[in-house]
């Protein structure tokens, strides 16, 4: 653990910060020699960073691994050894010069393929998003429709029945009319007429003579048949045959 911390500190300070500061001074003073030197160092250090990442995952268990890494970084920076310049001139420059065209072609192809890949991924993402949006809209519309349908059924089946029953129960006149049998309302007016007639006294022929006597200006009331009462059936009216009234003349004729 201590070796790892020391090696990381050396790489960060001597491998990154120190060369970065001297690169700044080379650019500021426009010293071509120093500029070329630090450019070669950054190329070698980029390759070192790639190798270090792989080595930390594979051979970090190797004894003295972190000590070797510290020594290698110091060797690259030392003005006496100039390790970065040696590696660049002996290995990297010849290799990059021979593979430069192939590397350029690979970079161009990678750019084109990456662009096509990004476009395809973008189209697929938009298609998936549109499908998800349409599905969500359809599901939401179906849920809203079912909810409205349930509300409509409730309004049509429950609320009117309750209101009708409550109005029927709370209105005695309406309840009495609805409880009457069919056709009873047509005879309601006849009962009033009959009550007026029934309230008057009805006499037989002998009683009419004995009780009231005979008068020229007044006729004697006699019993009428039940057919005298009007029996209404809708707009039709059936009347019984009227018997002639008894007066003094007709009574004398009947006695003789």
Curated annotation (Swiss-Prot):
Bilayer topology annotation:
Multi-pass membrane protein
- CC annotations in GO: cytoplasmic microtubule; endoplasmic reticulum membrane; endoplasmic reticulum tubular network
A GO BP annotation: cell division
Q: Which UniProt keywords apply?
A: Cell cycle, Cell division, Endoplasmic reticulum, Membrane, Microtubule, Mitosis, Transmembrane, Transmembrane helix
Q: Which residues form a coiled coil?
A: none
Q: Which residues cross the membrane?
A: 1-21, 42-62, 68-88
Places the protein is found = Endoplasmic reticulum membrane
State the Gene Ontology terms under molecular function. Answer: microtubule binding
The UniProt annotation puts the region (Disordered) at 177-256
In the UniProt record, does the keyword Cell division occur? Answer: yes
Role description: Microtubule-binding protein required to ensure proper cell division and nuclear envelope reassembly by sequestering the endoplasmic reticulum away from chromosomes during mitosis. Probably acts by clearing the endoplasmic reticulum membrane from metaphase chromosomes.
What name goes with this protein? Answer: Receptor expression-enhancing protein 3
The species is Danio rerio (Zebrafish)
Taxonomic path:
Eukaryota, Metazoa, Chordata, Craniata, Vertebrata
